[in-house]
Every structure is written in C-alpha cells, then in structure tokens.
C-alpha cells in the first residue's frame, strides 16, 4: 500500500432494522414533547464550506495540501443530504467575517438547519484566514438566537478541521479501551449549537496530502453510511472511533511519525438531530 505523508493544520513549526420514533407524549400532562428537531421545512438549509489552502507569506504558514479533497468530499456529502452547499476558497480573515455576517442576515425561515465547515490552519479558539487569525467565537456569534432570529431553535453545526495546539498524541497499546478526561474549550452556552472539532483541545490535527484530513474523510464516510438511519451524535461517535482506530500518521520526520488523533464534539443541541424525516 502506497504511503503519502501526513501534515498538520497548524502554523509551521519548522520548515436488522430498528424503527426510531421522533417524539414522545407526556402521559401526565397529555402535552406532546418533540424530542427531535423539525427537519421537514421546505429546505434542509445552507452548508457553507470555507476552504483555506494558500496563505499569505507574512503568516509563515504552509499550503494545506489535500484540503481540496476534503472540500469536494464535503460538497458531495451534504449535497446528497439536500443542503444548499456554497464553497468558498482562500478567504482572508476579513472576508470570513464578512461572509458569515452576511449569511447570518439571510432569511432562514424556510430552512431546517445551518452548517458551516471551516478547513484551515488553527490554534485553540482560533481559525486562520489567509492573512491571519480570527476568533471562532466571533464567527459563531453571528448565529446566536438573539442575532439570527430565523435560526432560533434550529440546529447550527460548525465543523472545524484545524489544529488546536501543538501537542502530539503518541497513542497507547490497549486490549480493553482507555478513558481519557478531555477538557473542552469553554464555549458560551447558547442553545442549539454543535461544534465538531477534528481534534481534542491542545492537539495537532492530521491531514493526508492525497486523501484529505482524517476527520473529514471519516465524517463523510459515516454520513454516507448512516445519515438516513442514525441520530447525528451517534454518527459522530462512529466518526470518533474511526479516526481513533484506523489512522496513524506517516511522516519522514520521526517526531511526527506514528501519531494518533481523537476528534472532540461539543454539543449544546437540545434535541436529537436526524437528517431524514
């Protein structure tokens, strides 16, 4: 099997069928309590994919080879799920802010949900435009319920393929599984947001120059298999397992060879999310 080198999404450091019922009724009050998001609006929603590959020389950040594979894979996956996909390439930090501000001002009243995918270099709490960093909190804040009223009560998903630090996970041999205490970034508790990070806080995120990033490969694969069968958090758990068990870095630099990765999901969703209805 041909090996191609893995890279990290950080600044350069050196050169049987089960039926699922989507609601329940309180036996005491007789009030219908819907446990899943309403996904039968006229439109599924927008999926914005920001794919930053080439960076200004002043940033000192290398090109992100393999990211175009991710962008194409995501476009196909979410188009098949009936989302209106908009791909944007090589945006500056100012352009990213302006784009998401503009999208948040659109009328989403006929849309079931919103998805934003960020493919770039990053650090903890930061994503990079082609000319420098921007706070993730600033970008997600445009879609808060008090700012984007037409998405209030609807699921807002942010999928982030980027490094969150410079730690490397060497992995551990096990025959029974391990339990790690992973403390995620403190995020404001606005309801109905979900953040799917490619890696745990403080760690590198790996990307293959030929096949794309481990996380996006796995996410698209699991969505293709299970989007019409499983709830989204269950799908993401399978993504976590796939990344954790099926990938290991290959690098000509011994310090970066044989490393592992685990995605991190931060959910403030208040209902179950199914991509079918």
Swiss-Prot record:
PTM annotation (Phosphoserine): residues: 26
Regulation: Inhibited by BIRC6; following inhibition of BIRC6-caspase binding by DIABLO/SMAC, BIRC6 is subjected to caspase cleavage, leading to an increase in active caspases.
GO terms for cellular component: cytoplasm; death-inducing signaling complex
Active site: 121, 163
Record PTM text: Cleavage by granzyme B, caspase-6, caspase-8 and caspase-10 generates the two active subunits. Additional processing of the propeptides is likely due to the autocatalytic activity of the activated protease. Active heterodimers between the small subunit of caspase-7 protease and the large subunit of caspase-3 also occur and vice versa. S-nitrosylated on its catalytic site cysteine in unstimulated cell lines and denitrosylated upon activation of the Fas apoptotic pathway, associated with an increase in intracellular caspase activity. Fas therefore activates caspase-3 not only by inducing the cleavage of the caspase zymogen to its active subunits, but also by stimulating the denitrosylation of its active site thiol.
Gene3D superfamilies per UniProt: 3.40.50.1460
Modified residues (N-acetylmethionine): 1
A GO molecular-function descriptor: endopeptidase activity
Function: Involved in the activation cascade of caspases responsible for apoptosis execution. At the onset of apoptosis, it proteolytically cleaves poly(ADP-ribose) polymerase PARP1 at a '216-Asp-|-Gly-217' bond. Cleaves and activates sterol regulatory element binding proteins (SREBPs) between the basic helix-loop-helix leucine zipper domain and the membrane attachment domain. Cleaves and activates caspase-6, -7 and -9 (CASP6, CASP7 and CASP9, respectively). Cleaves and inactivates interleukin-18 (IL18). Triggers cell adhesion in sympathetic neurons through RET cleavage.
Official protein name in the record: Caspase-3
Source organism per UniProt: Felis catus (Cat)
Protein encoded by which gene: CASP3
């Amino acid at each position: 099997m041909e090996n191609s080198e893995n890279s990290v999404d950080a600044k350069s450091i050196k050169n049987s069928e089960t039926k699922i019922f989507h609601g329940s009724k309180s036996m005491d009050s007789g009030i219908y309590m819907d446990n899943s998001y309403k996904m039968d609006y006229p439109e599924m929603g927008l999926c914005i994919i920001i794919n930053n590959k080439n960076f200004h020389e002043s940033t000192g950040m290398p090109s992100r080879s393999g990211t175009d594979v991710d962008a194409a894979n995501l476009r196909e996956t979410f188009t098949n799920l009936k989302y209106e996909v908009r791909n944007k390439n090589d945006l500056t930090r100012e352009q990213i802010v302006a784009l998401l501000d503009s999208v948040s001002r659109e009328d989403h009243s006929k849309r079931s949900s919103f998805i934003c995918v960020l493919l770039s270099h990053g650090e903890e709490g930061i994503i990079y435009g082609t000319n420098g960093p921007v706070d993730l909190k600033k970008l997600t804040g445009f879609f808060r319920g008090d700012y984007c009223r037409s998405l209030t009560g609807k699921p807002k998903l942010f999928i982030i393929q980027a490094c969150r630090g410079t730690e490397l996970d060497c992995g551990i041999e096990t025959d029974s599984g391990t339990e790690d205490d992973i403390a995620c970034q403190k995020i404001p508790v606005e309801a109905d947001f979900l953040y799917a990070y490619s890696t745990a806080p403080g760690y590198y995120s790996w990307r293959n120059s030929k096949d794309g990033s481990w996380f996006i490969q796995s996410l698209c694969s699991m969505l293709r298999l299970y989007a019409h069968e499983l709830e989204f958090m269950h799908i993401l758990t399978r993504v976590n397992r796939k990344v954790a068990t099926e990938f290991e870095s290959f690098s000509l630099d011994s310090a970066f060879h044989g490393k592992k990765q685990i995605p991190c999901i931060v959910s403030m969703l208040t209902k179950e999310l199914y991509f079918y209805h």
